[in-house]
Structures are given as C-alpha cells and as structure tokens.
C-alpha cells in the first residue's frame, strides 16, 4: 500500500483536492470480478456518479493486472481496458504506485522512468503508509 497523496482535482477544478493511494493485491479473482468488487466498494461508500470527474466518496480503478505467470494482461474490452488507459499520464496514479512498488513496470516500462517525465509538483504525501 502507498502513502495517501493529496493532489489538485483532475478534470473539474472547482472541487476539493483529491486523495489518492495505490493498493497492490494478490487475488484469485478475474479482472472482471475485481471490477465488480471495486464497484461494490464504491456503492458501499455511497458513491454517486452525477458529474464526470466530479466529487466522489470513493473511486476504485484497476490500473494493472498481472496473471499468475507474471504476465501483464492487456485488454481492449470497453468495460475494463487494461492497463488503465490514462495511468501513464497521471502523476496522482504513478507517484503512489512507485511508492508502493519501486520496481513497478507499466507495459514493460519502469514506472520510475514514466514519472520522471511528468510534472509531480502538486503530488504531496499527506499520510504515510
């Protein structure tokens, strides 16, 4: 698990800051089952999808799935694109991920190298793991 990071809101600036963290989990579930589990967690947190990129109580995204053989799964299924299509552009995803797993790779590229190309000035750890 990463520290919790605070970042300015993404997409719609007129809202409170975002709090972001990464959890790395080992499960026997399929990616689709993980998606459903994340959606149940969001529902339990009373998430309401009223405005795209708007405020939410919880937002669970599946960034990457690695199978039992250590192979990164790639999917173009519109319901669950893997790896997450915007992850490589979002410091608020990659900085916590790097903190949780300094050896992380995304599509074969070290996450550290991707982070080095991003503006991370607004990504600030507020709660340590």
Model regions: which residues?
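Flexible, gly/pro- and Lys/Arg-enriched active-site loops
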Residues: 10-19, 32-129
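Short, charge-patterned binding micro-sites
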Residues: 2-26
């Amino acid at each position: 698990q990463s520290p919790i990071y605070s970042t300015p809101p993404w997409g719609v600036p007129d809202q409170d800051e975002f709090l972001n963290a990464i959890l790395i989990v080992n499960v026997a579930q399929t990616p689709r089952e993980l998606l459903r589990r994340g959606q149940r967690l969001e529902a339990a947190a009373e998430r309401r999808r009223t405005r795209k990129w708007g405020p939410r109580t919880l937002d669970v995204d599946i960034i990457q799935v690695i199978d039992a053989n250590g192979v990164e799964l790639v999917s173009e299924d519109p319901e669950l694109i893997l790896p997450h299509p915007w992850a490589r552009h979002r410091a608020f995803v990659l900085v916590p991920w790097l903190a949780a797993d300094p050896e992380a790779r995304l599509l074969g590229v070290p996450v550290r190298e991707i982070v080095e190309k991003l503006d991370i000035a607004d990504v600030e750890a507020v709660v340590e793991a």
